Amino acid sequence: ELEVTLNDNRKFPAKIIGADPTTDIALIKIEATDLPTIPFGDSEKLKVGEWVLAVGNPFNLTSTVTAGIVRARSRGNSGAGGKDRSKIESFIQTDAAVNPGNSGGALVNTKGELVGINTAIYSETGNFAGYSFAVPISIAGKVANDLKQFGTVQRAVLGVLIQDPQYVPDAEKEKVKVFEGAYVGGFAERSSAKEAGIEKGDVIVAVNGVKIKFHGTNRHDSDPVTGFAISLAQIKK
């Protein structure tokens, strides 16, 4: 059983609508009225150096707020959060202090808008060591909507092995015509992209009209939905 305690100490039994281990996000439902809400910000507009606030309950110290700045956007996993998080390529990295009990708490901008969900730290001790990570609200929002509509997160697979075009092997680099996008280094055993004519050495520069920068920028906007056709823009090798 799951019980939710609100800031005014009201308690409600909660029903789990769905959960997504990859993002460590669950959608729950309670039967209640007069619930406050928080406005959503645009995590895609966050800038490196911008101030943010992390809200949570570290070490059971309720309603703790820490401040920091955005250190990086679209940060890869880098070992934070365990193997399930390796599929997330768009963490917001901050230096706001995050400790056990902060996970699931809000990351807000200076306008009080929700821009991320605090989820992990990079530490050898288990406590804050200067680096914390949050799932951008643009991804968390998609996860919540999918859980509400389908019960699970809808993730389609193109079956391509990609890498940053700037770091392809020297023998292949002279064939690369653009250096922003996703370089196709190979294919999975079953690949819808290969069947559609994508070739090894191509650079995918947009999905459904959304420009791609390597390592997850705009990844959530361009995520294909299972069962629907998508449009790829690529530069041929």
Language model features by range: what are they?
Residues E1-E199, A206-K237:
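Serine-dependent protease modules
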